[in-house]
Amino acid sequence: MIKVNRYEIFLDFSFQTGDYKGYEKIEMESDEETVVLDAVGLKIVKAKVNGKEIEFSQDESRVNVKSGSFSGILEVEFEGKVTERKLVGIYKASYKDGYVISTQFEATHARDFIPCFDHPAMKARFKLTVRVDKGLKVISNMPVVREKEENGKVVYEFDETPKMSTYLLYLGIGNFEEIRDEGKIPTIIVATIPGKVQKGRFSMQISRNSIEFYEKYFEIPYQLPKVHLIAIPEFAYGAMENWGAITFRETALLADDSSSVYQKFRVAEVVAHELAHQWFGNLVTLKWWDDLWLNESFATFMSHKAISQLFPSWNFWDYFVLNQTSRALEKDSVSTTHPIEAHVRDPNEVEQMFDDISYGKGASILRMIEAYVGEENFRRGVVNYLKKFSYSNAQGSDLWNSISEVYGSDISPIMADWITKPGYPMVRVSVSGKRVSLEQERFSLIGNVENLLYKIPLTMEVNGKVVTHLLDKERDTMVFEEDVKSLKVNVNRTGFYRVFYYNNSDLVFNSNLSELDKWGIINDYWAFLLAGKIGFKEYERVISKFFNDKDFLPVNELSNELFTLHAINPDKYQGIAKEFHRIQLKNWRNSKDELGRLTYSNILYRLAAIDDEFSLGLSELFRFYGSLDSDTRQGVAVAYAITYEDNSVDELLERFRKETFDEEKLRYLTAMLFFRKPYLVGNTLSLILSGEIKKQDIPLTLSTAAYNPYAKSAVLNWIKMHINFMREAYKGTGILGRRLAEVIPLIGIGAERETEQFFSNLNMPEAERGIGTGLELLKAYSRLK
């Protein structure tokens, strides 16, 4: 048994070369003959136990120290180097006029930085001291307690952290600018590269309000004296919850009054998500990566709860359903899915678990359970859980036990069904007079999955009255007092299942449908179309009832579906996609509220991509681009690119190169990915290899281009030629597999055999699940071409 109490770490950096020398003292106890430290890419120089130098051996991932049983101090002297090839461990994040050094350790990359016991359950305190060149700012989890000049450099000594896991340690070095809110505890600090920090005031206010919300909800104060929000110019993920030093890509942290509604929504959600982790993940941490979903789904769930409280007019739970639940339902419909609680044998498998199942499905199940036990019972259960396991480790069963104790009934059997089984059910509903027949089966887009039985907490509205029923067998029948005239199942879509009204869909339209109900019908029928359960005529008959709808959820869901159909086959689906988007453009043109402006922005951009005639007129606004509001700009830029093609390249490229803020830069990039001519899109993709498109933006670039039906071959060919480049850029992140799952179903249309052959023959264990998902979705999408 090994117990680690404390790391005392000294690091001496050369900012110019990226080399550093390290010396650490690990206060610990061990009854093992050999202590095994995790270390990757580090050179171990010397090891001592209680002052005595001892033998060690080193391989690619571990250091074996022949210590014998001891209690005391393990000292390790080592050397490391900042990487420029990947975006994990300790790496160089470049920007136009320089670079910063930053770290990204989750899940298993603290070992790339220092020799350590890189396991979430082996919590310890960290005391960090860093010596670095003058003129730089150094950021870590805790405040600087002492700063002094020494040998022409500056030494920064940081306060000691609370007990925490290695993956939450952070170090950033660079020419950072900062703004502070010191009015209350904790101090909130936003740090950016020069010239961008003023765009951090919105996220600073979100942070203050979110912390106050969480302190009240969890009944536990934020535990550190400060929290840094750090914008990193190259960052693989959206953000990372390092305790007290949260890192973000710039588009997930920076926004102001000139930003689009989408940008503000994104910043608010990501900031609130990472702050939720400061309690749920940092204060109480998973025992092992099997329960990764608990960290991520809970932070996703709580961020939407917080933003709904802070901005009631944003209707953020609608936004949750449209983005989180919708994506999770699709990814959970194929054989390559996994249970929410998936057994992780090797830490290297962890990266593939940061997906729509761990985030979106997990959060949707939490929403379902909260509805089942009640909001206050759910909250009190969470509070008890956090207080019981503070500064310690826990697992999913501990949370269910805490909620069950408050609720007064054991919820574990229901939870087990939803978190240990892959997939989800479809409930087939048929009506005859007073009888409602229910039948469940596991839903699949391709039909190649094991059928499973689920405990489904059904909610139904029959003739205007709400009824609940636990469907825990394959078939069941309910008999009502009078003939069923109106019926809807899964009221307000709180349940994670689909409903197929067998020859009775008109009964649904006799019901009073909420916005969430309408979204559910549209989303279900899209899935049934993809699965081949209905034909396009039946799908069109159902969705046509919502063509002139004026609610955010159904309109944006239909826009997503019709835009996808257009990407699959523009000749076949352009007419219906154009008709819908033209109707809705009129409905939302004069919207003033946030959801209305967001919807208008989406409709405008997509209509420009679909309708050449509309683009021709809209492109005339490009001459006034600088004075346009931010919600209009994307549509205008796309229209300009489509209308002028070759003649727009120089202008768009020049603006792309000059722009310093990523939000605007990505608008120009998106426009250049919607050229009609494939070679122009290919030229845009070449900006990846030149480094003009950041590594962090490669996935977004490819998924955006995949929705251009005229560029499928260009995108597929680029990926085939440069798959090894992408693999190296995203090594250790799991991002490549997740993005291929989104891109393959579209770029493979019309080249199914070529696509399947290429991706099936790749030996890429780190992307295996994502590739499998993409190829299965390609089979479903190909049915519609």
Swiss-Prot record:
Co-immunoprecipitates with the 60 kDa chaperonin. GO terms for biological process: peptide catabolic process; proteolysis. Preferentially acts as a leucyl-aminopeptidase, although it also has activity against other substrates. Optimum pH is 6. Can be phosphorylated by cell extracts. It comes from the Archaea. CDD domains: M1_APN-Q_like. It catalyses: Release of an N-terminal amino acid, Xaa-|-Yaa-, in which Xaa is preferably Leu, but may be other amino acids including Pro although not Arg or Lys, and Yaa may be Pro. Amino acid amides and methyl esters are also readily hydrolyzed, but rates on arylamides are exceedingly low. This is Leucyl aminopeptidase. Zn(2+) binds at H273, H277, E296. It comes from Saccharolobus solfataricus (strain ATCC 35092 / DSM 1617 / JCM 11322 / P2). Optimum temperature is 80 degrees Celsius. GO terms for molecular function: metalloaminopeptidase activity; peptide binding; zinc ion binding. Its main location: cytoplasm. Its EC number is 3.4.11.1.
